[in-house]
Amino acid sequence: MLFFSCRNGELIPPPDSVKQYLHISHTRTNNNNLIDSVAESISYQNFDMLWLGGDLTYTTSEDDGTMSYIDSIFTVSSENTLWSLGNHDYSELSRIQEFTNRLPYYSCFRDGITFLVLDTQDSLSNIVGEQKLLFDNVLDTIQESTHLILLHHKLIWMYGDFSLEQEIDSVSNGHLGSCFHCINPNRFWQDLYPKLVVVQKKGINVICVGGDIGVFTKEYEYLTQDNVQFLASGIKEGTNNNKALIFKHDVTNGYLFWEFELLENLTMN
């Protein structure tokens, strides 16, 4: 199975009939429970799926009013909206579950793609307990998929790799440390990555998509030597050149294309 990606703004033209998915993250403002005004004006109904990278508002789950506001924009109650929770979303997990009918971590299958949504706030960036059991079960049993996509807020794969760790302060909103919003020391490379490589070697393309960027950079790509793809997109409210990540999926042939797109361009569609 061939796999294409976009780099340097060059998008390989996909077939006419494709599905479109949007990854957007860190839409919060600094002093209220609204989202960035440009992000608010995007026509999200134009996309077949929404992948939310977390930190939607300043305290997203604090009250029903804010959750209803978020639901009116992103339709978080829809099975086609996948949400990896960030630290600013984490006030009341029970309220989020009431709106989404999901745990903070879950898996699903859509049109040949297996999705695994991780909760990187739980256990300070470590995937353990029931969440690790879910991870193991999905990766041990995955078969009829062209892609495995992991959605997560924190860039947990930046810790434990020398070259990636050097980039943390210029890429991730949260620095390396012990705080709740930090990239915490974790065992991604020991406990998760080897199984991702096994899946990749089966011919199933593995993509990890993080959401905790936007303050220092709006886009990030890194391909490991095992061809596991790391991506991240996020915005900072009120700044220029905010970007989201658009995926175009040729379901028939199993191709997945992506590009980073300026938010302003999405409001014109």
Model-derived regions: residue spans:
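Extended active-site neighborhood of metal-dependent phosphoesterases/phosphodiesterases
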Residues: 64-147, 171-179, 191-207, 213-256
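Active-site glycine-centered loops adjacent to acidic/histidine catalytic or metal-binding residues
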Residues: 26, 54-55, 86-87, 153, ...
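A solvent-exposed, charged loop/short amphipathic helix patch at secondary-structure junctions
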Residues: 49, 162-187
